[in-house]
């Protein structure tokens, strides 16, 4: 490999100014993401605020309904991935390799591992809102459409998808909103001795 052939290198072998700028910008962005990780409620409040600003913008401009519909479907897709287990139980159940010994008890605690973790869900949802907001600044994305039909399509899609997801949750007995293994309290200490 000759000098200057690697990505971002200038003719003299040092990283170019543009590469260093975007590299530093990426580091700052990642640093902000890392700092925001423990503040779940604050992150979601900011995202809901952005969503509210976006909805007001669409309402005032009276357009960009296709962009809003696409954003709604994208958020629905993210939500379904958030509710789904990482390993589909129907795939684990269908393996017919012949008779096998039981390896688990039915009541054994298994933590719910999501297909899409909460932080990635929040990050993707927020980026989706920002991209949709940017699209509202360009007239090319303002496709004329009768918006009540889009609302009806979205409600139907939401109901059908959630019905299927809830049936899947009931069939394979998993709840995506558990907070760990159930803990039982023992009997209170009734045999206390009193000092006289």
UniProtKB/Swiss-Prot annotation:
The chain crosses the membrane at residues 41-61, 63-83, 140-160. It is found in: Golgi apparatus membrane. InterPro entries: Rer1 (IPR004932). Its main location: Golgi. Keywords: Acetylation, Golgi apparatus, Membrane, Phosphoprotein, Transmembrane, Transmembrane helix. The modification Phosphoserine is found at residues 2, 6, 10, 95. The modification N-acetylserine is found at residue 2. Belongs to the RER1 family. This is Protein RER1. It comes from Rattus norvegicus (Rat).
